[in-house]
Design a protein with these regions (language model features):
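Extended, solvent-exposed segments with strong compositional bias
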Residues: 30, 36-48, 188-201
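Short beta-strand elements
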Residues: 77-121, 247, 254-255
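Extracellular ligand-binding interfaces
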Residues: 123, 135-217, 222-240, 246-260
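Short, aromatic- and glycine-rich surface loops/edge beta-strands on solvent-exposed regions
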Residues: 63-77, 219-223
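Short, surface-exposed loop/turn segments at beta-strand-coil junctions that are enriched for proline
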Residues: 58-63, 204-208
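Surface beta-strand/loop "capping" patches
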Residues: 1-20, 30, 39-51, 56-58, ...
Length: 261
């Protein structure tokens, strides 16, 4: 599918982003809050065609609906300061206008003879180009990042696989790798050398020190310096702090993938 964006250009446009998902719920049932919170929104680069802004939307499935919206970013004439998530102060130099979300049902996709072009892959993230568009953080002053890519069927873990990636840091540090309610600590050597990391489900522990059984149904993947794991409701366990304060420059990552055993 191709989406066309009609944006107000009476004010200079800094850039346009298009996000889309096939995790939208259209079955008429009560909202699946877990799915709603875990949806993975793909980013689609925007270009111009015959004087209009357009974006191609490669799909993985014809059995799920398509939800899509656009963000249009404009520069502010003067900076504006305020308070954001968790009362953190900020100064904005631009503002964002989001479109109304457009929805295409499975029947509409099939009637339009939409083609599926995405295939399963073990490479979850190459950390190239605009990769940050598909990751997020509630604390932009820190380097820690999260993604729901692992919730998408395109990146389903093969049976018996490990999650692997490479990381490079200037100083020795303790890296926290998180999956849902579990996390693992990884000792980094530093010295600006690429270090290969491989982790099994049992390397991830929750606040009760219980290991992750397998990769099935995982929803969120995180990389950070520290995080606090919360025990489930009714548990006698206490919150568990994982990791340590970061030293030096933010780390670099490459080749996040599932590695078959």
């Amino acid at each position: 599918p191709v989406v066309t964006i009609a944006a107000d250009d009476s004010k200079e446009i800094s850039y346009i982003d298009v996000f889309y998902t096939q995790h939208g719920q259209m079955d008429g049932k009560m909202d699946d809050s877990t799915n709603t919170k875990s949806r993975f929104w793909r980013h689609a680069p925007v270009g111009t065609h015959k004087g209009k802004w357009t974006a191609s939307l490669p799909l993985f499935s014809m059995k799920k609906p398509l939800w899509v919206y656009a963000n249009v970013r404009y520069k502010l004439d003067q900076p504006i300061s305020g308070a954001g998530y968790y009362y953190g102060s900020y100064t904005a130099h631009s503002f964002n206008l989001s479109s109304i979300m457009k929805v295409a049902s499975v029947k509409q996709l099939q009637a339009a003879k939409t083609l599926v072009s995405l295939k399963p892959t073990n490479l979850v993230e190459d950390f190239q180009g605009n990769w940050q568009k598909e990751w997020y953080s509630y604390k932009p002053e820190k380097w820690g990042i999260k993604t729901h890519k692992v919730y998408d069927e395109q990146w389903t873990a093969p049976e018996g696989a490990k999650i692997s990636f490479e990381v490079r840091t200037a100083q020795a540090n303790l890296l926290t790798v998180g999956i849902d309610d579990h996390a693992s600590e990884v000792q980094l050597h530093g010295k600006e050398h690429w270090q290969a990391i491989e982790l099994s489900p049992t390397d991830f522990r929750d606040a009760e020190d219980k290991p992750l059984a397998n990769w099935k149904g995982i929803k969120q993947f995180r990389l950070d310096d520290t995080e606090r794991l919360r025990p489930p409701r009714g548990s006698k366990a206490k919150a568990k702090l994982v990791g340590a304060p970061w030293k030096g420059k933010p780390p670099e990552f490459r080749n996040l993938r599932w590695k078959k055993g």
